[in-house]
């Protein structure tokens, strides 16, 4: 998120989250008008564009000015504009980037929604008409159409129950967790909304009414407790979120998994589950950690549903303009529900008639509202940029999705029941692994002053290795590469010597013998890997091998347990370097730009 001024007098100030793709053209235009830029940011172009339009038309009102600015912008953005010329007003707008408004009042509001005001179709008053004519004459800048006059009215939402006006405060943010300490009443803006705050009022405008568009924006109560976004006894949010995982996965399963009756109930999918069973293929589309969680469950979906499965990185999916058909099911996985690439891919799939499913952590997010159906992962607020508990909750929810899809397959029932039994035990097994926290911290001392690290896994554990490598790169800034064990001899083995740090995932499963072969190849080249192995495995004697033992569970869930030591390893590597664990450089929690 970036803020910038229009000039040294701060006539206009802009706070901007997103990316303006045509800012170079705007900059070139404004430079011909005599503007001098202080930075290379796209945000500065917005502020100077606002000043240019105001200088040309000093009688323009703030909302009409913002509309004229927005019409010139291409890309995705959430904007706040403030001006010394409109000292009691703030205008906010969003397009492709989240924006939420918190509302705090002393008494209960009369209604729990705000009306959306659309452009008037009738003739314009003389003042407004002349304003629009003047705008149309401005060089190289398009004016809003004549019907775009924005009218002001007092919103009925902010009266108290007895109909009397009352004091009110507004809070604007791209993330509701930043607002919860002030109020739990929030309103989510939709794309192309313009919010105008003035004189203790909030008016929401749209310049045109889309077919089927809602006439109101609901004021919702967010279910976040303040202590959930406080660190408590932990040093960092990431550490807190790692240790919350035994509870967060229980929350993901609560009311959905019945281990006694061996049933799965996913209310958000109930209406569409039979349609999904008949689909031609299932496409998982995600970015970053969410992509790795999709990779981790691909095998269980293929095994239980026998439907072709593909897993796509949203950015690559868009670059290829991959073919999507009406009988496909496209599953979008995102912690925030606002990931820009995933949202663009979602629109691509909707345009082609595919059934869309959202698996998100944030209720009311763009993905949750745009998809046909979905699952809320119930992980709770995740503050640390490096995702931990969202990964395991996504994993669990997608396994339950696969179990629900295969409910009608008689040949799969024994396997389904075994997986459900495994899910019922996973929380206690998490607690067991977390008790090794200090041992893992001590193991990380071996990586002191290292420049690179290798992570090896096979089968479903390749996804675990990918996720572990991402965590280490994100927060410790240590180069880390995840390699499929089967690919070791196809080039990567040349890197192995006694000085290269290597972590190998070698828990017992059907591929253990093949994974062990890779371990022996590393040992033969004088490598001394740290091994993540099954508890009590005699293959790796403690006096000869540095190891982290994890409980044994059913193969499709083993990745849930194996990722916990890697999360802890990433955390302690970053702490040892004195780095900002929660907010690593150059990264953002919600990636709302392409």
Where do the language-model regions lie?
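Glycine-rich, anion-gripping cofactor-binding loops and their flanking helix/strand elements
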Residues: 103, 107-112, 120-123, 131-135, ...
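Conserved short alpha-helical segments that host acidic/polar catalytic motifs at enzyme active sites
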Residues: 1-231, 235-238, 244-280, 431-434, ...
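Short, glycine-/Ser/Thr-/acidic-enriched flexible segments
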Residues: 8, 19-21, 84-88, 95-99, ...
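Generic C-terminus detector
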Residues: 204-209, 219, 223-227, 238, ...
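Glycine-rich phosphate-binding loops that contact phosphosugars or nucleotide phosphates
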Residues: 269, 277-425, 458, 505-546, ...
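Active-site phosphate/pyrophosphate-binding segments
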Residues: 245-283, 326, 352, 363, ...
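Extended hydrophobic-aromatic, low-complexity segments
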Residues: 206, 293-295, 310-311, 340-343, ...
